[in-house]
Amino acid sequence: MKKTTNEIRQSFLNFFKEKEHVIVPSSSLIPENDSTLLFTNAGMNQFKEYFLGQKKKFYPRVTTVQNCLRTGGKHNDLENVGYTKRHHTFFEMLGNFSFNDYFKKEAITYAWELLTSRKWFNIDKNKLWISVYEDDEETYKIWRDIIRIPCHHIVKIGSKNNSQYDSENFWQMGETGPCGPCTEIFYNYDDSNKSNDFLKDKNESFIEIWNIVFIEFNRISKTKIVPLINKSIDTGMGLERISAVLQNVHSNYKIDIFQKLIQKISNFTEIKDLNNISLKIIADHIRSCAFLIAENILPSNEHRGYVLRRIIRRALRHGHKIGIKNNFFYKLVPSLIEIMGDSAKILRKKEKIIEETLKIEEIQFSQTLDKGLKILNAEIKKSTNKTISGKTAFYLYDTFGFPIDLTSDICSEKNIKIDFKGFNIAKEEQKKRSSIKNKFYKDYNKDIIINDTCIFEGYKKNKTKSLVKYIFIKNESVFLIYKGQTATIFLDKTSFYPESGGQIGDIGELYHKKSRFIVENTKKYGDTIGHYGKLISGKIIVNDSIYSKINHVYRNAIQLNHSATHLLHAALQKVLGKNAIQKGSLVSNTHLRFDFSYSGNINLSQIQNIENIINKKIRSNDLIKIKNLSLEEAKKKKAIALFDYKYQSSVRVVFIKDFSIELCGGTHTKRTGNIGLFKIIEQSSVSSGIKRIEAVTGQQAIDYLHIKDNDMQNISFLLKCQNSKITEKIKKIIIQVEKLEKKTDQLQKRENIYQIKKLSKKINNIKGINLLINTFTNYDQKSMKMIIDQLKKELKISIIIFINKNKNDFTVIIRVTKNLINYITALKIINIFIKKANGKGGGKKEIAEGGGMNIKKLPMILNYIKSWITIQLENIKTKNFNN
């Protein structure tokens, strides 16, 4: 009986557990402390620091099943997914690792035993072929003499392009660093194929199933390597590939987990061919999307969020392609969790969040997908040179949310190319327009570059004696400044906190003798701190000894809001769930703003619950403790950290009893009671899946409540009732207004009927075509539209133009029946009005509207329009019209 994929995964772990390996869980898809990777793409990623010698080994032998994602860079698998047998965005990598424990002989022996022994995978030995690095004679002999592989089943692979160590069988982490030869195990699907030159032939019958890397050298340069004292083993075997082998299928998409998913997707369509490319793409993409969202990545227009959005939209487009009309993608999540078995633990915890996130993204994109596809298909039909312009591709990207690779995917199916250069030019032009639009002033100080440091003493001191090291006016270094000059001053040490981590910079003053410099803002410049402000008396010279003194009241207000921000983050996670994760913040002296991930709606009851939790912590007057810990210690204490932030090995951790633990470099109040009061003043949605809360604390919160009290008093006065009766009084007023609106509507309908009868007498009949032009004065626009639409229904062949005069301008509504639009259109008529009366407007062939027309030109335009339309109608033959 064939093993299931879930059984194969567990068998691998059980085997290496018997070989005294410690089973280590899969690390996050988001690499920790590794800015070189967007996503975890190999089993060794979580052990990179051990291979580099940056960390001491924790276990000599470990084994893992690592979740991996490959969508860009060297491993750009996205465009190949579904079209090949073995490309995936998400996959599971089986691996065993040794850190200065066993080496080549044991690693090869273990691999062979697992693959071929009856107890384990029981693969026919004759179907396995081996590649080794040509200079790695030791490995070759282990395969030949110990494992007893026939020589014609072992292939030596040399370097490419005569470049030493540049080989498929020589692994390296980078241009320098740990490296070593590797040996690969291949499975031959074809019994008749006996070629020992299978790699050069690119023979599809041979599939690489396991790569064993021997990390035994340190690369010093392109041509020089030296032996490592501590040698390691790094292996990788794709779960999907080995499952295909053990289930005797020649494509990863034929294994049990994919077949179940594909079958589920096909239930949404009339397609029963499970080899359909779109079905395979959707099956692959639901896996990567679900696991990314489970890792707290949400769809957005940048960084990892945009990768997720691209994958989702690619899947949705393929759903559309195979005829799925309704939202379907999010409905696959429960089936995915059931199918994935043990590896779906993280998905089970986040099931509702994953579903909700996918549903929102699907609804949003479905609103633009059809329109975008119509435009793209029209451009493809028009294309004479088999190329879509960069401007069109960018228009689809910018207006309809089509990622460029999605447009490319559609075009490649029809052998159409994209002008990527033109796309990038259009994208850059848009960036420039945006930057010009948002640039209200030039920040000259951003160009200041100083290769120096400044000691920050502001955690403990409000005042510091300092030395002036540099002075800049705009971006130019100067030796001194005089009264009235604005500058940025750099000191050797300071008590001023620089703008950082969402907290605004301190204000205050720098002074000595008769010189006084008012600091208006403080910013970081590399490892130093700039004090921006204006000298109001005396002069300041480089190397002057001065005092730096912060505005204590200003700092204190900031500290209250910063500590309150930590309370808010913790309260949000208690009320909304652990997926409410910080995405941005602003901590100022007047208020705080907090952006966080959350895909659902937040109701008033939840807001009040959050406020109650925070104010309860404020009343408990807990001590706020700050400790400097190693990053490892902080993680053990489950301190909250920002995913994309690069932390040092030593970090500052803020503890608010057992309620909140966060990594933070900002300033805080000593006790929660100092905050006094916390009040949320605004809750909004910043973008898809990102919410924002704004709040005030202390005196600002009291002032806010006073304003609300004043508003209530004013409303009470206007309604002539007590505060407690306001809601009841407003309900009565609403009922009265609704009754009056009904009466008004009835009167308006009567007025409309009267107007229709009156206007019917003004119709001109030209060769069987009804022409009606009428001018109203300050008439209800909604009623005008109702009248014109009713007349259009009654007058089967007609052109109707309504003009509504106001004090300084006039508006125009035009309707033309469908049987006339081949001769005269509403759009053509409105364009005459726009051109001659300097107005604005637009429309379609049957319907057009405009406004802002110059009223002085109305008589002249009416005469012109009447004569122009009459001439057009005189030339029309009406015998073919359908009355």
Swiss-Prot record:
This protein's UniProt keywords: Aminoacyl-tRNA synthetase, ATP-binding, Cytoplasm, Ligase, Metal-binding, Nucleotide-binding, Protein biosynthesis, RNA-binding, tRNA-binding, Zinc
Subcellular compartments: Cytoplasm
Enzyme Commission number(s) of this protein: 6.1.1.7
GO cellular component labels: cytosol
Enzyme class: ligase
GO molecular function: alanine-tRNA ligase activity; aminoacyl-tRNA deacylase activity; ATP binding; tRNA binding; zinc ion binding
Keyword RNA-binding part of the UniProt annotation: yes
Cysteine pairs bridged by disulfides in the record: none
Names of the cofactor(s): Zn(2+)
UniProt xrefs under InterPro entries: aa-tRNA-synth_II/BPL/LPL, Ala-tRNA-lgiase_IIc, Ala-tRNA-ligase_IIc_anticod-bd, Ala-tRNA-synth_IIc_core, Ala-tRNA-synth_IIc_N, Ala-tRNA_ligase, Ala_tRNA_ligase_euk/bac, DHHA1_dom
Principal location listed in the UniProt entry: cytoplasm
Recorded catalytic activity of this chain's protein: tRNA(Ala) + L-alanine + ATP = L-alanyl-tRNA(Ala) + AMP + diphosphate
PROSITE patterns membership: AA_TRNA_LIGASE_II_ALA (PS50860)
GO biological process entries: alanyl-tRNA aminoacylation; negative regulation of DNA-templated transcription
Known partners and oligomeric status: Homotetramer.
Function field: Catalyzes the attachment of alanine to tRNA(Ala) in a two-step reaction: alanine is first activated by ATP to form Ala-AMP and then transferred to the acceptor end of tRNA(Ala). Also edits incorrectly charged Ser-tRNA(Ala) and Gly-tRNA(Ala) via its editing domain.
Name of the protein: Alanine--tRNA ligase
Upper taxonomic lineage: Bacteria, Pseudomonadati, Pseudomonadota, Gammaproteobacteria, Enterobacterales
